[in-house]
């Protein structure tokens, strides 16, 4: 696959990260194969996870083709950039086409990135996963590699202002590969959830204590932070979805439409999907 824009974009991003004083704390990157197809499954805590997550494959000199929602590709600036990097557009109403494209990429030996939670976790713990990651890996016959991101939420996430002040640490932990067979997608997805959750815990444990004091808003409640509990996060997600659907219905001129109306009721402005 010919890449004209991806390498210079990476160089530009690295320069920007140096300006921001970002420190990368990485582990397990040897699990990303240097050749052949592989599916990287990331947790999702930030709007820029797909920007920073690609660095998990840099030590192996691989470029990650991320699956991202269609609306990102519709943007007049972001769309051409995403297409030039050969990322994969996902239509949440009809995911068959994007799944076929991901399978083709993987069978051609590419590395594909997916966010099986589908949307950002407000609790910063791993939410329930969609089964797409295990099904795609099984059908393509490639390893499924869990990757935990930590600290990205401090820069840009839901319900909090952006903070690009200098000197933050970004944790990236790559786990050992799984080899789904597709015989039991439910069990294989549960195993992916277990592994991804364990990697997130490792990333939290390894994170500099001075940057992560008790009571930090970016810490899960279970780790002494003030982030919403998983239960409360689900409630907030539902409230956001209902409010968004109602706004869309009103904009369409339907005052009687309920909170579940609107063709894009599941779209939350989040660039990455699973």
Q: Where are the predicted features?
A:
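Extreme N-terminal tail/first-helix region
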Residues: 1-16
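Glycine-rich, highly charged phosphate/nucleotide-binding loops
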Residues: 23-25, 93-99
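Short acidic-hydrophobic, aromatic-tinged amphipathic segments that line or gate anion-handling sites
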Residues: 26-27, 88-91, 180
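N-terminal signal-anchor transmembrane helix
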Residues: 15, 19-35
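Generic structural signal for residues in well-ordered beta-strands
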Residues: 24-26, 87, 170-172
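Catalytic core of membrane glycerolipid acyltransferases/transacylases, capturing the structured
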Residues: 10, 18, 33-94
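Non-catalytic C-terminal accessory region of glycerolipid acyltransferases
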Residues: 4-5, 96-274
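Short, structurally constrained coil/turn elements
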Residues: 18-20, 60, 108, 166
């Amino acid at each position: 696959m010919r890449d004209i824009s991806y390498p210079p974009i990476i160089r530009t991003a690295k320069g920007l990260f140096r300006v921001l004083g970002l420190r990368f704390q990485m582990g397990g990157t040897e699990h990303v194969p240097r050749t052949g197809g592989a599916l990287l499954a990331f947790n999702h805590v930030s709007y820029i996870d797909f920007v920073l997550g690609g660095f998990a494959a840099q030590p192996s000199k691989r470029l990650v083709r991320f699956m991202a929602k269609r609306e990102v590709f519709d943007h007049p600036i972001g769309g051409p950039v995403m297409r030039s990097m050969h990322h994969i557009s996902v239509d949440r109403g009809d995911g068959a086409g994007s799944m076929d494209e991901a399978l083709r990429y993987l069978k051609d030996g590419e590395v594909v990135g997916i966010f099986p939670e589908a949307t950002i976790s407000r609790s910063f713990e791993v939410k329930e996963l969609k089964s797409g990651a295990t099904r795609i890996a099984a059908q393509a016959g490639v390893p499924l590699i869990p990757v935990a991101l930590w600290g990205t939420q401090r820069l840009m996430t839901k319900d909090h202002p952006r903070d690009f002040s200098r000197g933050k640490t970004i944790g990236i932990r790559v786990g050992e590969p799984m080899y789904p067979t597709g015989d039991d997608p439910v069990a294989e997805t549960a195993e992916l959830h277990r592994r991804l959750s364990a990697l997130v815990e490792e990333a939290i444990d390894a994170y500099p204590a001075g940057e992560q004091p008790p009571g930090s808003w970016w810490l899960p409640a279970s780790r002494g932070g003030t982030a919403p509990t998983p239960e409360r996060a689900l409630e907030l997600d539902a409230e956001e979805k209902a409010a968004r659907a109602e706004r869309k219905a009103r904009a369409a001129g339907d005052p009687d439409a309920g909170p579940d109306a609107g063709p894009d009721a599941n779209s939350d402005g989040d660039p990455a999907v699973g």
